[in-house]
Amino acid sequence: MDNYEKVRVVGRGAFGVCWLCRGKNDASHQKVIIKLINTHGMTEKEENSIQSEVNLLKKVQHPLIIGYIDSFIMDNQLGIVMQYAEGGTLERLINDQRAIKDSNMREYFPEKTVLDYFTQILIALNHMHQKNIVHRDLKPQNILMNRRKTVLKLSDFGISKELGTKSAASTVIGTPNYLSPEICESRPYNQKSDMWSLGCVLYELLQLERAFDGENLPAIVMKITRSKQNPLGDHVSNDVKMLVENLLKTHTDKRPDVSQLLSDPLVLPYLISIHCDLGRIEPPPTDKRKPSASLSSRLRTYPTQSTLRPYSLSSNAPTTHLTQLTPMPSHIDSGFFSSGRTSNQRTQSRSQVHSKY
């Protein structure tokens, strides 16, 4: 903690407290989140759980995942230093929008915004799933945002699990409203459980209410195992309703995986737009890699928003001209998104590039 100054508590968890801190030794006084965990009296199982979280944070470095910066041990406390997301949680954004809706203004998020958020989460999950990691607690509270509310970052890997290539987990864990049927029924589960949770998040973004809610846990579980939720409103297009329906299939073999969704015509235009912009996101502070030449060339050859024209199976797809583009397979994620520009390159290009990121 010698390099950081505490500002305020921003969260409390099962093992510790999360502090917003600022750096002492750099001119910018960079703000970070430091999770302080009291290790005194911990059981071996609890220590392994904490170490697992640190290892996963190191392993999943990605522009759309909260970045790991450092860790330290001091006075029987383990400190995990992570990126700070100024925009707060997606849960707070939904609650604010719900308050507007409840004031009889009937304001929902534009479907384009919802699908952009959805695709960002999908890309981050793809990065995790390719590493055989299941998040296990995907929910709006664990999705953070930048100050402009344009970039989402997955967070809170305290209960994430790394699977073997052919294994499945069986521990019942996660937030009740977003649990998949297989977890509720104590059946083995895998990455498809994250897809169910993603469907719940998508439903909530569209409807501003939880897909599965009830007065008590048994009532919630019963709704989940039967996939019984209120129908989406008329403000949601049929294509997006079908997307939610597919994600909330009770049988995992009927539920799409990440790679299937990344090639879906409904998602593809947003995927291309995000691919064009992610090279402009600052990489995590620990990422010392040099900018990728292939990344720069891809950013130059992809169209910009000013040169795009409408494309869609759905009227809600963003403006995109795809006739000369080859759809990108999902496996390019790990290579394409792992690269970033250096600070000098970003400074030089900032005046020339107008990006939501």
From Swiss-Prot:
Pfam families: Pkinase (PF00069). Residues 281-357 are annotated as: Disordered. It catalyses: L-seryl-[protein] + ATP = O-phospho-L-seryl-[protein] + ADP + H(+); L-threonyl-[protein] + ATP = O-phospho-L-threonyl-[protein] + ADP + H(+). Its EC number is 2.7.11.1. ATP binds at V10, G11, R12, G13, A14, F15, G16, V17, C18, K35. It is found in: Cytoplasm. Residues 293-327, 336-357 have a biased composition (Polar residues). Residues 4-267 form the Protein kinase domain. One of its GO terms (molecular function) is protein serine/threonine kinase activity. Belongs to the protein kinase superfamily. NEK Ser/Thr protein kinase family. NIMA subfamily. This is Serine/threonine-protein kinase nekl-2. The gene is nekl-2.
